[in-house]
């Protein structure tokens, strides 16, 4: 992680989010976002854009729960902060959910004072796995499920419920398998196979900031290791390593029908 003062300021901006969540300080949490900020939680669901929508998101998913952030690693790359973590969410019925997650915060300078604000928050976690965990938690889990539905409908409306459930769609296990195939091909220095796994105009980066050519990427990521793969929407996030460096990788699949199942973007953050 960069040790420059500006990187420290970016990280402090991001760390204010779990602090406000833990304190149940809605005004502070909502105020961390830029004027037209957005929350994608989970990635693949309909984003919550603007103060009113973010406020309703807080009322639905944060206010009724006790949420603890267990952060394992932070990476600052350009104006983005990536977090590798597990979230422990205790619902009103007492059931606690353990949710493996990667977070990406895109930060901007916003307002007359050019204060650092969160422009976009992307939460990569698996909605299907969370629902399975909740339903498998016995009577407390079933009761929590029964309460969550009306909460969603009250705060988000029918369209909001449908937008949230969009998070159930996506690349799932097939996407995670494709990412593992990419890592294996890179490790074998099998550039032809790497090429078949990427869409023709794939965006590649070894640091989440600078674009890399296919040759540069294949050479620089030849020892890429991937772990903790999470499928969210059309993306897979992963804990990645190169040598002794640990970071977060974001793998975005193409929506181009001419290149089905290929990766449109591979961004590695260290």
Regions found by a protein language model. Give the residues of each.
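C-terminal and inter-domain tail/linker signature
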Residues: 2-270
């Amino acid at each position: 992680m960069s040790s420059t003062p500006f990187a420290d300021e970016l990280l402090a901006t991001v760390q204010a989010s779990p602090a406000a969540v833990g304190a149940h300080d809605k005004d502070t949490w909502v105020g961390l976002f830029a004027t037209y900020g957005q929350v994608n939680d989970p990635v693949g669901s309909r984003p919550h854009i603007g103060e009113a929508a973010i406020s309703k998101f807080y009322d639905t998913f944060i206010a009724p729960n006790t949420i603890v952030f267990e952060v394992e690693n932070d990476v600052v790359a350009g104006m983005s902060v990536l977090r590798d973590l597990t979230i422990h969410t205790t619902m009103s019925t007492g059931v606690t959910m353990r949710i493996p997650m990667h977070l990406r915060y895109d930060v901007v300078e916003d307002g007359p004072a050019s204060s650092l604000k969160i422009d976009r928050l992307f939460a990569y976690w698996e909605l299907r796995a969370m629902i399975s965990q909740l339903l498998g938690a016995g009577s407390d889990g079933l009761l929590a499920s029964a309460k969550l539905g009306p909460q969603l409908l009250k705060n988000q409306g029918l369209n909001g419920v449908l937008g949230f459930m969009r998070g159930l769609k996506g690349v799932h296990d097939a996407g995670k398998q494709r990412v593992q195939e990419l890592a294996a091909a890179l490790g074998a220095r099998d550039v032809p196979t790497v090429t078949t796994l990427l869409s023709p105009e794939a965006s590649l980066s070894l640091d989440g900031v600078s674009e890399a050519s296919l040759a540069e990427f294949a050479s620089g990521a030849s020892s890429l290791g991937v772990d903790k793969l999470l499928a969210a929407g059309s993306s897979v996030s992963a804990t990645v390593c190169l040598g002794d460096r640990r970071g977060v990788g974001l793998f975005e699949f193409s929506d181009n029908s001419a290149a089905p199942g290929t990766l449109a973007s591979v961004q590695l953050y260290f």
